[in-house]
Amino acid sequence: MAPAGHPGAKRGILERLESGEVVIGDGSFLITLEKRGYVKAGLWTPEAVIEHPDAVRQLHMEFLRAGSNVMQTFTFSASEDNMESKWEDVNAAACDLAREVAGKGDALVAGGICQTSIYKYHKDEARIKKLFRQQLEVFAWKNVDFLIAEYFEHVEEAVWAVEVLKESDRPVAVTMCISPEGDMHDITPGECAVRLVKAGASIVGVNCRFGPETSLKTIELMKEGLQRAGLKAHLMVQPLGFHTPDCGKEGFVDLPEYPFGLESRAATRWDIQKYAREAYNQGVRYIGGCCGFEPYHIRAIAEELAPERGFLPPASEKHGSWGSALDMHTKPWVRARARREYWENLLPASGRPFCPSLSKPDV
């Protein structure tokens, strides 16, 4: 199948999902831009949209070229409680960058908010909703296409976020960073999904904290909860680009490798093709990634689901399906790897003879 850019005119997120179209999200910004020298670990705030706009623009472009058709604003932790006086300029600049790149393809712009830094200590609903509302006002001013509330570990705060975002006329998606065990108050994934849909979310799911396998288990529990309650919503999954079977309820932040030693846990492109197919088979139609999800991972989703989408992304022009380009290699043992069976069954080594395959979480 030849690369074909994108089909037709832009449609809204719900129109796409309701027609059965696969929507491919973007991937890692904080972790990737930290590695590239544009984000400081710790607070993980997105000043880069002002300080280094070219770096953010380039990453958006890489995801677009790889197959993403949602450009999410780089506004993680960009509320006033984290950024003080800079928050408004950062949110506005992030919207402008996302819109600029989205205009180069068949991509929508999603304005994103996340859990606040104050909820754990002061469950002040009015104050927290004010923080969400401030960001929403910028997103409305910049005319984003839809809204995403992501990375919530407490469903109560996620519900507050949805309630605020529903004050606009834009569709609302919400994803929680929880495992199959549920949120930090032991509310099950199924019950979380029910509460979020009742609050007004049209799209629900999970993002970050856990790898693809764990995230898909959580999504299945959300799906079952909605079915039991007789509720309908579109499903969305954006996991880590890392393998994390050994992490606890808090996710990868508990692992001793977080955040500077995660490279040995990176998913291969073939792992991600498997994830994309499994997500699709579960009924998920909004499929993307979060921390550690590089552009080549997004391309893997787009390639795996090209039969359903009807086209390949531009980045596939230089990438043979399942290693087929290796047919041209001069070494016969490398040419022998130009087949799907080889890559699907490979168990990659770390190259570190004294490394364990799993770690013990710190919490």
From Swiss-Prot:
- Phosphoserine modifications at: S321
SUPFAM superfamilies in UniProt: Homocysteine S-methyltransferase
Q: Any idea which UniProt keywords this protein has?
A: Metal-binding, Methyltransferase, Phosphoprotein, Transferase, Zinc
The residues the record assigns to binding Zn(2+) are C208, C290, C291
Cofactor annotation: Zn(2+)
Q: Which reaction does it catalyse?
A: S-methyl-L-methionine + L-homocysteine = 2 L-methionine + H(+)
Where does this protein have coiled-coil stretches?
A: none
Q: Which domain of life is it from?
A: Eukaryota
Q: Which InterPro entries match?
A: Betaine-hCys_S-MeTrfase_BHMT, BHMT, HCY_dom, HCY_dom_sf
Q: Gene behind this chain?
A: BHMT2
| Any one GO biological process | L-methionine salvage
Subunit structure of this chain's protein: Homotetramer.
In terms of Pfam families, this protein maps to:
S-methyl_trans
Boundaries of every Hcy-binding domain copy:
11-305
Function in brief: Involved in the regulation of homocysteine metabolism. Converts betaine and homocysteine to dimethylglycine and methionine, respectively. This reaction is also required for the irreversible oxidation of choline.
Q: What is this protein called?
A: S-methylmethionine--homocysteine S-methyltransferase BHMT2
